């Protein structure tokens, strides 16, 4: 680490490192994550050893080298080499390999209008399976993989294929492949590259960006939880031995833009797009719990915002009957210091309208 710049994220606990000598080509790399976050500063001792200062925990912790993994685990340079996607080399729509299980969440995450194909594998067919924790999040065994391919809705051209992986040593990491313009192949990216589709344009996330949202508190694998799958699909996966029984999970989300009750649809949309960070133990600011089952009080109903009121008089996180005074909705409308903070350049007009309609329908802060 000598000669390299190290910095940390107070909220997530992610520590990054980059080479300042690389100039504008410098790409931050995720060094490690301090459980619980709370990284306030760094210090060196007389031997040059590095320490992390944690404010709320009142702790000084030493950075020590991690043991080298027993087996190197690099990702292939080309998507076709992963074995997870069928790439015919002629520009046909890529499809997940037969060994992967396809799925569609009930309440999809907003990604600037891009369409997505999703699949996963426990990583050791016939032996390993996904477990389910008390929150209903599926927990992957070592070598488990989730994959998502983004397509441009205007011409169905593949733009990007992302992987989120639990490695053999138990660590998690995200990787992404950028599709070539001819759609014949995709190449491993470092992050920061521009995606220029016909109707969708955005910037590829870095591996550090992936870990900002894919946190332990939300089970790491966002979107893969019992509540995001219909009961028949859950039962089918359980019967096949792919996932453990989620019989204790009673929560199921609803399609945000379907015909269910307004409150349920808004709760599902917020759960999908916001609760990865805004939940107990998550990195979201404001001490909010935006999981679908959380109470209105936990979601910030009639609570003054802890960070910024955005210049709004008498602002609340959720102001019953007044979306124009509700910071929750106002953050969704912004393109800077916004919610969600990563993974999107444009706002979700339909999602904003849904949440504002729900807030407008509230007469008081009782579920």
Predicted regions and their residues:
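Sequence/structural signature of beta-propeller domains
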Residues: 1-145, 151, 157-160
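Sequence context surrounding c-type heme c attachment/ligation sites in exported
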Residues: 36-37, 54, 68-72, 80, ...
């Amino acid at each position: 680490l000598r000669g390299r710049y190290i910095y940390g994220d107070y909220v997530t606990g992610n520590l990054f490192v980059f080479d300042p000598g690389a100039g504008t080509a410098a790409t931050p790399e995720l060094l490690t994550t301090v459980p619980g976050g709370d990284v306030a500063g760094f210090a060196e001792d007389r031997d040059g050893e590095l320490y992390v200062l944690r404010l709320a925990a009142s702790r000084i912790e030493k950075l020590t080298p991690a043991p080298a993994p027993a087996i190197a685990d690099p990702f292939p340079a080309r998507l076709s080499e992963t074995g997870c996607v069928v790439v015919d080399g002629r520009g046909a729509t890529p499809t997940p390999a037969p060994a992967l299980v396809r799925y569609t969440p009930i309440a999809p995450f907003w990604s600037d209008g891009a369409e997505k194909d999703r699949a996963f594998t426990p990583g050791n067919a016939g032996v390993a399976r996904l477990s389910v924790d008390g929150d209903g999040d599926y927990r992957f065994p070592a070598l488990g993989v989730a994959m998502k391919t983004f397509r441009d809705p205007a011409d169905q051209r593949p733009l990007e294929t992302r992987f989120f992986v639990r490695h053999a040593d138990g660590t998690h990491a995200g990787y992404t492949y950028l599709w070539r313009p001819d759609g014949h192949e995709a190449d491993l990216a470092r992050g920061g590259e521009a995606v220029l589709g016909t109707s969708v344009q955005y910037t590829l996330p870095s591996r550090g960006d992936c870990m900002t949202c894919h946190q332990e508190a939300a089970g790491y694998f966002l979107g893969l939880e019992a509540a995001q799958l219909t009961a028949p699909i859950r039962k089918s996966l359980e019967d096949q031995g792919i996932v453990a029984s989620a019989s204790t999970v009673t929560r199921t989300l609803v399609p945000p833009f379907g015909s269910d009750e307004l409150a349920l649809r808004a709760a599902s949309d917020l759960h999908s797009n916001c609760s990865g960070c805004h939940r107990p133990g998550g990195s979201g600011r404001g001490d909010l719990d935006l999981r679908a089952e959380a109470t209105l009080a936990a979601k910030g109903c009639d609570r003054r915002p802890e960070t910024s009121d955005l210049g709004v008089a008498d602002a609340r996180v959720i102001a019953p009957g007044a979306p124009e005074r509700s910071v929750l909705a106002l953050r969704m409308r912004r393109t800077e210091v916004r919610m969600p903070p990563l993974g999107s350049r444009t706002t979700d007009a339909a999602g904003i309208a849904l949440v504002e309609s729900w807030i407008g329908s509230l007469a008081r802060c009782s579920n």
